[in-house]
Each structure stands twice: as structure tokens, then as C-alpha cells.
Amino acid sequence: PARSIPACSRQPGPGLVPARLRQPHRASPTRPGCDNVPMTALFAGLTTLDVLHRLDHVPDPGLKVTSTDFTMAAGGPATNAAVTYAALVAAARPRSADEAEADSPAPSPSGEAPTLLTALGEGPVSAFLAADLASAGVRVLDATAPTPPDHPSAPGERGAAPASSLREPAVSSIIEHPSGRMVASTNARLDADPGRVAAELPERVGVVLIDGHNPALAQAALTLGVPEVDGEDPFALLEARPPHLRVLDGGSWKDWLTPLLGLVDVAVVSEDFAPPLLARADGEQVAGFLRGFGITRVVRTRGERPVQYWWDGTSGEVPVREVPDASTMGAGDAFHGAFAWALERAGDADPEGLIRFATAVAGVSVSSFGTRQWLASPALAELVRG
């Protein structure tokens, strides 16, 4: 059965949750020690180096072109969602007069900063990613697995690829132009060992979000806060529940997701999310498939078309506001981060309110080029404060 986890008893004030999401009559906490726990979240998944170029015309593949804009930042679904969450934390925090005069809100240095469980790898690219995420207000737990001494890529092995090249994070090169975009990516190639950083995981969080890029990281995040269970009982882990909701960012189907779906409370999927045997699945079929694993809350994004939802027996659509000259890179990730932020603070009783807020934040994200410029927009504070 679906669980309804009330918002934390530390009553969110006007500067924390938009008026349209506030639920002043919700019961005070059932989470143990909730009064003393900062509102925060755990994100788990892929981190890449995103190199983005913008063109003012459709490129000719035979010609060298000059970009009109360029940026470089840490990317990846869970990573961009964590950055969005951190930006909303900063926008919600009361600011001094000096901060108000600054160009953008400072990243949150408090316990509210989201934690990102990921694999950064080694080398200068990894160092850049760590610095970029720190400046964005994201706390990073790097679970990159060590290279075994007998691995073919270990130093001294003849004919092996340089170990350094296999220890570097994935790189995505994105060219955005008026008719769309082109992407070339090395994809995920780092092994992760979350046990290396298990002691640094937050004791309690308000929400957990995983993307579909690393089963070890997903397993560690989804079992955070779960009581110890009888290892001989195959259903014990499914029945043991943490005191927070767990969200799946389902951009596309991955076969390894199947044994973990029973640990998910809310699935936010894209139109490309097509489970086995549902090659051209519609929303009803996807929601029905996930319902078979006990997931009774499903949100399905479809680009500029209305967002669909199926929520504890109800269903509907929420329209998406059209943004002219939209730069859609990372828009879905911004939606997921904003959805997690609102779910953690406002609870789960109003799915349409959660979706409206998340689509509004995603709308801000597409109003400027890249995945970082929009974080300085005053529109974020306006959305947060309702």
C-alpha cells in the first residue's frame, strides 16, 4: 500500500514552501527526531562533465562552426537534480541585505545542503566536477571503486588502456542549435562502491532520488534508513520502510531496475521510459506496469505536452507553460530536483501542486542557455515564496 509521509513538524514558513503547496493542517511529525533534522535530500546516480555549445544556425557537418555561447559544468540526471534542489534551498533561505545585493543566492552551507552519492573518478576533470558541485551548494560523496591490483588496466599491465583513462568520469559534448541538439557521450564507465562512504551518508533525509545509471548507488540510496531485516525472508526488505519517500527518476528503462522497483514509492518517468514488452507503451500501460511493483504514484513528463500522473487511484494532467526560445538542456533534471524539494517540504497529498511547482521551476531552467545561468534567476525566489 502507498505510504503518506507527513511533512516535518518544523512548520515550513512562508519562505520555505510556496503558498499553493502549503498544508497548514497536516499532522505533526511521525518521523523520529524530526524536529532536529534539517530538511535535506539524498540524490544518487551519474555525474558527467557536460561541455555545451550553442549555435545560431543548424550546423553543416562538413564545416567548422563558431559557437555563440559556451559553458562547462557537472551534469547527469541525479547531479542536475541535486543542483536544482540546492538552488531552491538557497532561494528559500532568508538573506541579509548584503546577500540581497549580490547577483545570485549563495549556496547553502547548512545541513540543508543536498547530498549527492556518485562516482567522480580521478584526475583534473574529477577535481573540476567536485569544485563545481561545491560551488553549487551540493555535498558530494564520491563512491568511486578502487582499481584492483590485478585489473587489466592496472599500471604495468601490457597492452592495457592507460589506467587514468578508465578512472575519469564520463564526458558529454552537447551542441544546441535552432532545430534541436546533438550529443556525443562516453556514458557511465566508473564502478562505484558505496560501502566506501557508507559512514558519511546522512542519518536521516526527507526524500531520496535515484536515477537509472548505477545499481550499486541506487541500492545504497533506496535502503538508507531501512531497519535491519531477516536476510532469509525474500519479502522482508520490501516490507521494511524508511521514514521518507523514495523517488525514481526514470529517464529510460534499465533491466537492473526490476529488483529495486519494490523499494520505490514515487516514479517520475519520461515518455522514453518503456519497460519490457511495452516497446511503445502509453502512460496507462507504464503506470499499470509500475503498479504491479506496488508503485501507486507515477508522474510522466512529455516535453512541452501536459504532465500525466496516476496517484493513489486518481489520475490527471497538468499543462506545461510554453517558453519561447527555450534551451531545454537539463529541464527534466530540474523538474525532478524541484519535485523532490516540494515533496520533502509539502508532503504528498497534492500531486497537482507538486507538478505545477516542478514545471514552473523547469520553465525557469529553459529560459537561459545551459544548466547554471538560470540558477541566478530572481524567479526562483518568487516561486519558492509563492
Language model: regions and residue ranges:
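Conserved phosphate/ATP/ADP-binding segment of small-molecule kinases
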Residues: 224-317
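Short acidic active-site motifs
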Residues: 193-197, 217, 255-257, 285-286
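Short catalytic helix/loop segments, enriched in acidic residues and glycine
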Residues: 56-78
